[in-house]
């Protein structure tokens, strides 16, 4: 069976998607919550003000996908197709998402909520967490080399359990690197 290919299309609000390869498509205000995108391909697509919470992503391909003002609660990015996996997030809710063992170097998270998000064993080299809330996010054996946390907040990262060489942190965020020592740091 031949796979459907859609290029330069705009999808608005309540349109349903079928399994296909979507390239340079834009999705505006769509509610895909609890849907199944298994095997779908999204190449250079933009999602604006969309709800993808709890969507199944088994072998889903995201290549240079952009998410803006979107709700992505509980997504399992760790089940996506690894080939070319790349995306950026601007003003998105990614609480309870999983990036476990993903290789997503240079990913930009801007103004995002990433509470209880799992980054264990992920490669986030050169990634940026710009003004992101990382409360209870999981960083274990994560590669964070050259990552930028200067404006991120509420994170706890154990430098002994993660690779943080040349990562950038602000003075205000240093306490998040020392949490395991249970020391009082006064401002």
For each predicted feature, which ranges?
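Tandem repeat scaffolds
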Residues: 1-187
């Amino acid at each position: 069976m031949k796979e459907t290919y859609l290029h330069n299309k705009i999808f608005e609000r309540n349109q349903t998607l079928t399994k296909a390869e979507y390239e340079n498509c834009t999705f505006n205000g769509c509610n895909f919550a609890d849907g199944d995108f298994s095997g779908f391909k999204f190449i250079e697509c933009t999602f604006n003000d969309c709800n993808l919470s709890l969507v199944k992503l088994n072998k889903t391909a995201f290549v240079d996908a952009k998410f803006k003002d979107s709700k992505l609660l509980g997504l399992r990015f760790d089940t996506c197709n690894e080939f070319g996996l790349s995306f950026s997030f601007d003003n998105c809710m990614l609480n309870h998402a999983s990036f476990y063992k993903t290789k997503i170097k240079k990913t930009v998270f801007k103004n995002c909520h990433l509470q209880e998000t799992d980054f264990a064993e992920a490669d986030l080299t050169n990634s940026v967490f710009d003004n992101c809330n990382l409360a209870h996010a999981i960083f274990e054996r994560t590669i964070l080399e050259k990552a930028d946390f200067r404006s991120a907040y509420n994170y706890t990262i154990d430098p002994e359990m993660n690779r943080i060489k040349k990562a950038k942190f602000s003075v205000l965020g240093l306490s998040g690197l020392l949490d395991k020592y249970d020391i009082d740091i006064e401002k």
